[in-house]
């Protein structure tokens, strides 16, 4: 394998594949819903509209997270919502940034641990998304570096918390 060819092939994938995959995915999910009656999105939300606090996760933990949100709303009067990331790559930062804007706190729960890492994989992506939103907020509207992402003022950034679960079936 020639190094230049590998570099060019890797870099060349982005404009021809990555830039279109979100729209293609949305179209496929809509067609799937039409065929089966089951609707999916790249990011699904539960009671997020009025939520102050958000649980972000993926996969089978979402059912329990929704139960926790209901329980905390009923017993503690905390406005908790849930974000289910049904698609990890490409990361749906465009949708997530809008969903988390102005929330007080966000806990990102993952079924993994990386003891020497700064952040767990999902938290890295969430943090990168919110930083892009802050960068948009610092730029003039016509020069936003990430045009599909939300634009955050300093007060729109939620506090972030990270947790892991289900390690060794615990």
Language-model features: where?
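Peripheral docking tails and interdomain loops at the edges
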Residues: 107-170
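Redox- and metal-dependent alpha/beta enzyme cores, enriched for Fe-S-associated oxidoreductases
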Residues: 50-78, 91-96
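A structural-propensity feature for long, helix-poor, extended segments
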Residues: 93-114
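Conformationally flexible catalytic loops at phosphate/diphosphate-handling active centers
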Residues: 1-44
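Short helix-loop-beta junction
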Residues: 24-27, 35, 67-82
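Short beta->alpha junction loops
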Residues: 83-89, 163-166
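Solvent-exposed alpha-helices and their adjacent loops that cap or buttress functional pockets
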Residues: 45-49, 98-100, 152-155
